[in-house]
Amino acid sequence: MKNKRDLSRRNFLKNTSLGIGGGIVGTSMLSCSQASAGNRGKLPREVCIAAVDLTRLWPDSTRESRINRILLRMEDAVTVKPDLLCLPELFDTMWVNEEKPLAEVAEDEKVSGPVTSVIAEFANKHNCYVVCPVFTKSEGHFYNSSILIDRKGNISGVYHKIHPTKTECLPDNAYKGGGMTPGAFDQPAFETDFGKVGMLICYDTNWRDGWDNLRKKGAEVVMFSSAFPGGRILNYYAMRNSCYVMSSTGSDARIIDISGNDLAASTLDVRFAWETINLDKISTPAWTGKQIPDLVGKYGDRIKIKAWDYYDIMTIESRGPILKLTDLIKEFKIETKDILISTSEEAQIKNRL
């Protein structure tokens, strides 16, 4: 007996030249709105984030097949009711045997194209932000991009990969009909209804400039879409920037804490990672915590403190619905890691010979 979801998906995919369009139907998964009761106990700045990987989806024969299969994986991921879902770099074309000219597959950045439209409809249906990494074109240039789609299916922001590989930049070397233009160094962090987020792509992680820019722009979550997994360098930058990192790659997916420690990862049979994170959270060197006993004595289980010995980092987060961490920092004169580093740099500059 054929799977009903496969039949529905086939009908869904046949409507355009790409094989995608129409409506997302036949899914057996709950939408976020259907399961909203499960979110009522969330703290004010708690957010569920999820990332999928491409393992077992490549190589693939056609873009239509790839998009079909990634949508099924996304439907699995939305069972955890994410506020934000991240897809891998160039998920619709990466390791797909069907070769098409770049001008044909690149999407418009202002008006949703064939692929972006499908992902936008998915985002709207499931009431979640989605990072949609695709080729884009703008003013005669091609970019390796990540498009942030909001809960209503609108394009909320576009990021251009700052550091393409040399083969990406050379016309006809990697893609038919053109090479990639490197993105600008100064790109924004994007506002969402839960906080500021930023995006990086693959080879970008080998340079500090993108990470430094997002730190200055106040990104609390960095979405790393990639072909290669990134490895421990992602953990380093999560700790260095005191931000959460969610990685969605060709081989794995991970959620990384602001301390630099892994919180979740995709597994052999579950090809997405998810975690409910608290954005009302700071990191500070463990040796600065002399006032912590007083903090615990006053607020008890309304705060959560965890020491990460390997990095000598301690994280503090609010667990109370009306208790703001910014107020606790002022009350107990807690120096966050970022404040400690910036004030130390000021002292160094002032006293250096």
What residues fall within each predicted segment?
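N-terminal export signals
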Residues: 2-5, 11-32
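C-terminal segment of N-terminal export signals and the immediately downstream linker at the start
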Residues: 29-68, 287-291
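Solvent-exposed loop/turn segments at secondary-structure junctions
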Residues: 55-57, 91-93, 136-139, 165, ...
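Cys-nucleophile CN-hydrolase/nitrilase-fold catalytic domain and related Cys-dependent amidase chemistry
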Residues: 63-152, 228-229, 240
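Active-site catalytic loop in hydrolytic enzyme cores
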Residues: 138-217, 232, 236, 240, ...
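A short C-terminal boundary segment appended to hydrolase-like catalytic domains
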Residues: 281-353
